[in-house]
Amino acid sequence: MTNLLDGYPGHEHAIPIYPLYKDVIHTIAESRMIVTPTLIVSYGGPFAENYFWETEEPYHDAKLQHFMPYEELASKTRRVGAGWFMKEEQVFPKHAKSMKALVEANGLAGIGSHGEFQGMGYHWEMWAMQSGGMKNIDVLKVATILGATGLGLDKDLGSLEKGKLADLVILDKNPLENIRNTNTVHFVMKNGRLYDGNTCDEVYPAKKKLDRSEWNFEKPIRTTEVNE
């Protein structure tokens, strides 16, 4: 609260207290201080990333296997020493309830994946944000226009409007129906250039293959009959 009263424009990481009562929620909302809870590294309890390490299998994700060198992917996903926790020990759904209340009070919020695990971390953070009952449309707003507003970039980014930068993603499935459909990226448009979401090859306005020469380390070839 001292940050807020001193005029800080943003607060990163969750406020490690639950519940946040209406006086706190509405004060934050009316101050227009953006809160980026980074639930993936939740304060006050186990990190949300631990939950996703326990429940997801990122090693087998086709895109990660395509984009990440084998050594990098395997070292980060096959043996994770972050710890195992019973579901009821997780604190991030409680923090997510506070974020739901803040957004519904017209407050500013942002998505921050803290750089824990590239590619999937941002999706995990969105899924964690929804775990407290936030509407899927509000999660998407937090990931786009609300975050852009908090950074002062809403005149250029955050929504599809005439005059804004042509930065967007095209999905195969609707995240309004299931928030986990955020992880179905088919195309990415960056600054008016369209890229294949599975390969990062440019498909418009020119057709150009992604140069993987500096980091394309293949998975080792199996030379025995031993299965994983």
Predicted regions mapped to residue ranges:
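Short aromatic-centered micro-motifs
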Residues: 188
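Divalent metal-coordination and catalytic microenvironments
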Residues: 11, 35, 114, 129, ...
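Active-site neighborhoods of metal-dependent hydrolases
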Residues: 14-132, 137, 198, 205-207, ...
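Acidic, glycine-enriched loop/beta-strand segments at the rims
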Residues: 120, 135-140, 150-185
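A short, polar/charged loop-to-alpha-helix boundary motif
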Residues: 180, 203-214
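Functional cores that coordinate and move charged inorganic groups
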Residues: 1-7
